[in-house]
Regions:
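Short, flexible coil/linker elements and helix-boundary hinge sites characteristic
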Residues: 23, 43-47, 121-125, 129, ...
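Alpha-helical oligomerization segments
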Residues: 191-237
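Membrane-proximal, non-transmembrane alpha-helical segments
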Residues: 126-196
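N-terminal first transmembrane alpha-helix
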Residues: 1-109, 200-203, 219
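Charged, low-complexity, helix-prone segments enriched in Lys/Glu/Asp/Gln
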Residues: 74, 102-103, 110-111, 158-178, ...
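Polar/charged alpha-helical tracts
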Residues: 6-14, 116, 140-143, 192, ...
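Hydrophobic transmembrane helix bundles of membrane-integrated enzymes that assemble
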Residues: 33-40, 183-191, 205-209
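Charge-rich cytosolic interhelical loops and cytosolic tails of multi-pass membrane proteins
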Residues: 80-158
Length: 237
């Protein structure tokens, strides 16, 4: 089994942090700043006032506080809403679903090879005949085995890349979801105080909702590709 050195692990951690966490937050925070700026101008219609507001928004203390809060909320949203309530609610996570009897991603022979290898390594004790989504012990066995598989496949560069891609899509969804909530709140406020400018946010919301659907699909595909690569690398090592 190939092992990553401490230095390699640290390098990968920095790359993942930058690509899967920082970049999505920077993109969606920039969008939220634009959304707030449009709202300020719609309310006050004063470009000088808008410039003063923007100067406050880009101050270091505000950015630090906003980034911390925005990041925490977005990550929670991406985990609780995107993973648990949308893309993997009915189908389970790809790494689990792929080994179920009714899933056709892998052939029966390939599934048996994976299970047999897990048995040989002492990570599996259940009968393969109970490979279905209604069998909780089987699902738990897959989840436990996945931890072992992740450990022995950690060295693979392509697997790491796909993990970064999935993390990027997942966190981008979380940040954009928060932006969409901000847009909804602003539209309601403008609707109460203006007869015209709230309509701007209808178009913004349409674009955001379409983007959310596309990103959710992208995250789902990245998750499936990651799971396929995970088991392929496991069989090869």
């Amino acid at each position: 089994m190939q092992q990553l050195t401490i230095e390699q692990q640290n390098i990968r951690a920095k790359i993942y942090q930058k690509f899967a966490h920082n970049y999505p937050m920077m993109i969606t925070m920039a969008l939220s700043t634009i959304i707030l700026a449009i709202a300020e101008y719609a309310i006050w219609q004063d470009i000088n006032f808008l410039l003063r507001v923007l100067s406050c928004l880009i101050s270091s203390s505000f950015l630090t506080a906003f980034y911390f809060l925005f990041t925490r909320i977005s990550r929670r949203v991406s985990k609780d809403i995107l993973e648990n309530m949308i893309i993997f609610k009915s189908t389970r996570k790809p790494s689990t679903r792929i080994l179920l009897k009714d899933d056709e991603t892998f052939s029966k022979i390939k599934k048996h090879r994976i299970i047999s290898k897990l048995k040989n390594e002492g990570c599996w004790e259940l009968d393969m005949k109970i490979m279905n989504s209604n069998n909780k012990p089987y699902i738990n066995a897959i989840n436990n085995a996945t931890s072992h598989i992740l450990e022995v496949t950690r060295h693979d560069g392509i697997l790491f890349e796909r993990n970064c891609n999935y993390g990027f899509a997942r966190n981008l969804f979380g940040g954009l979801f928060v932006d969409t909530l901000i847009s909804v709140v602003i539209m309601i406020v403008l609707l109460c105080i203006s007869n015209v400018y709230w309509q701007w946010y209808i178009y913004i919301l349409i674009v955001e909702i379409i983007a959310l659907l596309l990103i959710a699909f992208m995250a789902y595909r990245e998750g499936v590709d990651y799971a396929i690569r995970l088991y392929d690398v496991y069989l090869e090592y």
